[in-house]
A protein has these predicted regions:
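Cytosolic, long alpha-helical scaffolding segments
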Residues: 1-248
């Protein structure tokens, strides 16, 4: 039940519960001795421990800001392709440095909270590190999108660009759905998120088929065009990975 509620594996739950099992607070069958729990960690009433609530709010706000920042990073990266604009691509890459710093801030904050109160090892707050790491990974793939403009001056043809626009739309929706589902507990959005992932994979297949068709018409001696196909394929893959990471 714990694994299902938090969306993590049973093995991970077992690892998290081990310290409490060793202290005989949680029985082997995972029956919690609430009296002993309160003696060791304070009241089990979620409204009692205001420090816990404030810690949640602090890190949740950091994650919301990180999600908004990453969406802006993806947006600017794709805008650089739409406009074939090197300066926009460079600015998008600069945003990724901020994304990395935001991840470190979330990680250090969670570590500090857990070190002060070991009870947090059993709470949702430990999953915030993983969520922040996933936002950082999305930022990395956004960087791959921006680097296309820096590495290649060839504008994307209209047909392929139309597919990429769809993939960008699904990527932005996926980030939003995942954030609302995780932070706000809007689990009903999981269906919408899975729909986005399915549509993303469909568009990825369409894009790669289009690229393969264009490659077949290109001479092997055309090195510049060959490099273009490598770079644009990375863009397609990056959008797909953003969708997959959002589901994670």
């Amino acid at each position: 039940e714990i694994a299902e509620k938090l969306g993590i594996s049973r093995r991970y739950v077992t690892q998290l519960l081990k310290p409490l099992i060793d202290e005989d607070i949680v029985k082997r069958s995972y029956v919690v001795d609430m009296k002993k729990y309160d003696e060791v960690y304070g009241s089990s009433d979620p409204n009692f421990n205001s420090k816990q609530n404030s810690a949640y709010s602090l890190v949740e706000n950091m994650l919301r800001n990180m999600a908004d920042h990453v969406k802006s990073e993806v947006e600017l990266s794709f805008e650089s392709i739409l406009n074939n604009d090197n300066d926009m691509a460079e600015r998008a890459l600069e945003l990724d440095f901020t994304t990395n710093n935001m991840f470190e801030k979330v990680r250090s904050t969670v570590d500090a909270v857990v070190s002060v109160n070991p009870h947090f090892k059993l709470s949702k707050i430990i999953l915030f590190n993983e969520a922040a790491y996933n936002y950082e990974r999305i930022g990395d793939y956004s960087g791959h999108i921006a680097k296309f403009v820096i590495n290649d001056e060839t504008p994307v043809d209209d047909e392929l660009l139309a597919i990429l626009k769809k993939m960008h739309k699904y990527a932005q929706k996926s980030i939003s759905y995942a954030t609302d589902a995780f932070i706000n507990g809007e689990l009903e959005l999981r269906g919408d998120l899975m729909d986005c992932e399915e549509k993303m994979h469909e568009k990825q297949e369409n894009a790669m088929a289009k690229i393969a068709g264009q490659m077949a018409e290109t001479s092997f001696d055309d090195v510049e065009k060959s490099n273009y196909y490598i770079y644009i394929s990375r863009v397609v893959k990056s959008f797909e990975r953003i969708g997959d990471i959002s589901v994670e």
